[in-house]
């Protein structure tokens, strides 16, 4: 029985989907003005793992994650870079895919961009105006009236006067009430804009998620999530917009709110605004992507996770332990899962840990129990060893790990020599990553040059439709 902590009710609840066997999930995506940082990675690795487990549990999952490709930050960065907002956003979206793919994060079913859905956002705003929850100001902005929402603050427990004190004290927009927030923002001279009933402008940040989630998932959503920093004001404002637009209750809008803990560095939240962040691109120059993924799941998803080199090195040691257990096993792809009572026992324990609010660290502990049993079986019972190894890889796949050849990960062939040149596995991965980036940017000459170099030293590349590349020794 799956239990999930619901941010709305502040307690663990037995999860029951709106429609039997199906789950609709909406997660707030990235504002694409810069490279993804490790805080983004933690949130998306967590929801990727939740998605994988729900599928393992038997659900059909419809997963939507939006892309904010127009925003004040995007406009400011485009001006700084002397490029258009379209070009900047498009470039950063491709970089985002490179970063998330390399962490073995599955693509959502839908990734709607805001600029592709301006009309439906305008219609959503129009509906709020018709129902007297929004108004047009003299300077052409459209504002949401928080005073029309009797239970504003239900998710975050913020009171309306706190909203003004903490968030809007510096906001110079014309409003009926200082706590009101913008739905449609009038474009300044030289800024990108779209034509609306209220003049030239662009959507506010909060309205895009209400409009897009409704368009793709309907009025009622099973799971809505994001980082804990989105609880207020973003998700609070989403609740206000969506419940007012559709005349629905808060708990019928979203069954379960899931929020991930922050990644911390020097006891502060890792974020771009504090300028204390590391990009995914920077981190994978030091550590392999699978180690990073393991690390990001090493604390309970609702708790803060402290970034340190020691913590990541410990994650790598843990992975090495698991890969060492798998080393030397000739995998039989037709091994039948669940065909042994012992393996059923491990799977049941794994499910119990994950059913308890997706307890990833406890789920890891089951993998180590299996690795211990596997090491014994490799000596005493080779048939059972193969079965245990297959089940270990199956459960690890739910966590998005142990997808590599153990020999490659452990470095038994870390050095390939050709014409007195050598490449470590880490260098091979780096070259493949560079080639993936070149292909994304249509730099075909560079892509071919990297492939040729790897081919010359006995590396075979296989490009997947997702854009990822798998490699092996010839």
UniProtKB/Swiss-Prot annotation:
Keywords: Aminoacyl-tRNA synthetase, ATP-binding, Cytoplasm, Ligase, Metal-binding, Nucleotide-binding, Protein biosynthesis, Zinc. The keyword Ligase applies. Binds 1 zinc ion per subunit. GO terms for biological process: cysteinyl-tRNA aminoacylation. GO terms for molecular function: ATP binding; cysteine-tRNA ligase activity; zinc ion binding. ATP binds at residue 272. It catalyses: tRNA(Cys) + L-cysteine + ATP = L-cysteinyl-tRNA(Cys) + AMP + diphosphate. Its cofactor is Zn(2+). GO terms for cellular component: cytosol. Its EC number is 6.1.1.16. A motif ('HIGH' region) lies at residues 30-40. Belongs to the class-I aminoacyl-tRNA synthetase family. Monomer. This is Cysteine--tRNA ligase.
């Amino acid at each position: 029985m799956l239990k999930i902590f619901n941010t709305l009710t502040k307690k663990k609840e037995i999860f029951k989907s709106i429609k039997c066997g199906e789950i609709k999930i909406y997660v707030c995506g990235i504002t694409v003005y810069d490279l993804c940082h490790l805080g983004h990675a933690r949130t998306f690795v967590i929801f990727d793992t939740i998605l994988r487990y729900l599928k393992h549990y038997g659900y059909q999952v419809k997963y939507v994650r939006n892309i904010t490709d127009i925003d004040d930050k995007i406009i400011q960065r485009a001006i700084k870079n002397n490029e258009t907002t379209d070009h900047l956003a498009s470039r950063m979206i491709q970089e985002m895919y490179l970063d998330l793919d390399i962490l073995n994060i599955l693509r959502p079913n839908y990734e709607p961009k805001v600029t592709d859905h301006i009309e439906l956002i305008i219609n959503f705003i129009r509906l709020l105006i018709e129902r007297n929850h929004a108004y047009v100001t003299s300077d052409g902005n459209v504002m949401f009236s928080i005073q029309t929402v009797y239970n504003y603050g239900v998710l975050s427990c913020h009171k309306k006067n706190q909203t003004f004190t903490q968030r809007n004290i510096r906001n110079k927009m014309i409003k009926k009430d200082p706590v009101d927030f913008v739905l449609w923002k009038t474009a300044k001279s030289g800024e990108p804009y779209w034509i609306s009933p209220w003049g030239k402008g662009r959507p506010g940040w909060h309205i895009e998620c209400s409009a897009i989630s409704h368009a793709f998932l309907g009025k009622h959503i099973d799971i809505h999530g994001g980082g804990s920093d989105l609880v207020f004001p973003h998700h609070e404002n989403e609740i206000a917009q969506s419940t007012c637009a559709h005349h629905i209750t808060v708990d019928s809008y979203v069954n379960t709110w899931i929020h991930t803990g922050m990644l911390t560095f020097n006891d502060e939240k890792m974020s771009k605004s504090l300028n204390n962040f590391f990009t995914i691109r920077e981190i994978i120059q030091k550590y392999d992507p699978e180690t990073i993924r393991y690390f990001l799941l090493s604390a309970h998803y609702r708790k803060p996770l402290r970034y340190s080199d020691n913590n990541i090195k410990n994650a790598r040691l843990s992975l090495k332990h698991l890969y060492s257990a798998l080393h030397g096993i000739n995998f039989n792809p037709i091994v039948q899962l669940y065909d042994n009572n012992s393996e059923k026992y491990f799977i049941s324990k794994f499910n119990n840990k994950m059913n308890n609010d997706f307890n990833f660290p406890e789920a890891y502990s089951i993998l180590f129990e299996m690795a211990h049993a596997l090491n014994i079986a490799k000596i005493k019972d080779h048939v059972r060893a193969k079965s245990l190894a297959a089940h270990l890889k199956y459960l690890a796949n739910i966590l998005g790990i142990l997808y590599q050849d153990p020999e490659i990960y452990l470095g038994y062939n870390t050095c390939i020599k050709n014409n007195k040149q050598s490449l470590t596995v880490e260098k091979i991965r780096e070259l493949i990553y560079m080639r993936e980036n070149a292909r994304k940017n249509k730099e075909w000459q560079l892509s071919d040059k990297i492939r040729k170099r790897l081919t010359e030293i006995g590396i075979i590349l296989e490009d997947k439709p997702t854009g990822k590349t798998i490699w092996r020794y010839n």
